[in-house]
Regions:
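Acidic, Ser/Thr/Pro-rich low-complexity intrinsically disordered segments
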Residues: 1-24, 54-139
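Predominantly extracellular/luminal regions of secreted and cell-surface proteins
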Residues: 28-49, 141-144
Length: 144
């Protein structure tokens, strides 16, 4: 697909999904145009009932804890990821790079803990490389 769409005047909602970008594009076409610029409103992918996800660089992944307490967010990879944790409004709570933990031999993985509130949304995002991200309610370093 070449990325071009020819539209007659009207209002359109297009869904975009691909490597590194997902979201909904809303655009109003009022006359014949040669170019159209639309913002992509990124949405988050839910962890659902799982405690791990393969996280692509730049994507948001939403986690909603079932109980209040300390949660541990960490990567297991062969790459060099950096982890970001955001609150329900996507305000940055913390970012971590190169933090060792017992579940990986890669010293470039990340590991962070945060006191989360039950029922609230938390967003995880990675940069550097796509990785497996895990969320646990017990310290993975204490599990061994």
């Amino acid at each position: 697909w070449n990325g071009y769409v020819y539209l007659v005047p009207g209002t359109y909602e297009l869904t975009a999904e691909g490597s590194g970008k997902r979201g909904v594009i809303s655009a109003k076409v009022t006359s014949k145009t040669t170019t159209l610029t639309a913002d992509v409103n990124e949405f988050a992918i839910d962890f659902g009932n799982f405690n791990d996800v393969y996280a692509e660089v730049g994507m948001y992944y939403r986690y909603v804890p079932k109980k209040t307490g300390t949660y541990y967010f960490y990567s297991v990879s062969y790459g060099d990821p950096k982890g970001y944790l955001y609150d329900e409004n996507k305000n940055l709570l913390m970012e971590v790079d190169d933090a060792e933990h017992s579940k990986t031999t890669n010293k470039k993985d990340f590991y962070m803990s945060y006191n989360c509130e039950a029922g609230k949304s938390y967003y995880i995002k990675v940069s550097g490389s796509s990785v497996d991200v895990y969320v646990r309610d017990c310290d993975p370093n204490a599990e061994d």
